[in-house]
Amino acid sequence: MKIKMPVDVRMIIDRIEKNGFSAYAVGGCVRDSLLQKEPNDWDICTNALPTDILRIFQGFHTFDAGIKHGTVSVVVNSVVYEITTFRIDGEYFDNRHPENVEFTDDLITDLSRRDFTVNAMAYSERTGLVDPFDGAYDLELMAVRCVGNPVLRFNEDALRIMRALRFASCYNMAIEKHTAQAIFECKNLLKNIAAERIVSEFNKLACGESCEYILRRFKTVFAEFLPEITIMFGYEQHTPHHNKTLWRHTTCAMTNIDPEPLLRITMLLHDLGKPMACKKDPDGTAHFKGHPKFSAVMARQILERLKYSREFIDDCVTLIAYHDVRLTGSKPQIRRVMNKIGETNMRRLLKVQYADLMAQSMYKRDEKLEKFNFACKSFDEIVKEKDCFTLKQLDINGHDLIKMGITDGKQIGETLNKMLGMVMDETLENKNSILIQKAKEINSL
């Protein structure tokens, strides 16, 4: 089995071997190559010590920040390559990092400490594929299987739970039976992992091809760091608009939208407030008036706890708050929504509403789609024609009003906003001379 390695990777391995050591491409780059995917990066393992690597690559730009764990980074043609000495990990006391590492001369020993069989393969042109744990076979089966005892692997590093789920979602892989059992058994260990690390994996998982299946099968695992979602499990919506439980609707809506973290997380949280907003008719039909507000408040709390960026949180909460706005296709209405949330979020909102609609029942679907398509058409025309929906686009500004003798700041703001509303509603033309005349009328000048 031959893998085509980049020229610079071959050069690094050749250089190490010419100095009397062995070296291999290892881990994800080997896995992706066997899957016929372009690796994001190439990692190299070797029996050379870090001091040997620093000597061998004298004259190259090197970093030794990871030298404690045996890693030296070498820069070749502006690309950073991590070269790590074969090692044995010491005991793990925090479910994340080994307390110490011990270097070894044995490749198989090094591979045995890795997380999954598909990541425990090494390759060099001299030896070919080194695969002591049948990772290539698991790749053929598209299976995620831990190296050795899965409970031990997850206790060593609980983030491996999220990595297993991410691989399954993004690579459309199955999780091997014993590995899956261990994930459920060890899920409480996720509480020991920093929010930023969980979010990094979860964002990728949420954008995976198989995220709907993974979110549904392993829902109790995700509830370890998202306990708020448990209220959606098995929650019947009792409305003709929905034929799925709230959790199934949510996961279905996620896969209906572009695989971007902001959009996928928005769909994950968009209906979280429904149980709190639920009111039922005497016949048992449920209504969820005001649920976007509940969902938005809960989403902000969750995203802040998980340490998402401020921009991400604000955009996500905005989309959730507006996701149930009934867009008629009226241009004045759409301009006013754009005024509140901006053009970029309006474009996202249309994607959110479509994903939500397509995860609902067939009840009135044609009617809903007709209105939705009309709204999209109106939005596209507003953007194309550069319609005014912000004060910045208004063909008059505060300086014009000051020249007219209006100097009070509050009065200036009220005048401009009143005229903007009229322009958005198409009752006033966005033309400087006309706006000046209207400003005089408003202020009785």
Mark where each language-model region is.
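Catalytic cores of the polymerase beta-like nucleotidyltransferase superfamily
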Residues: 1-445
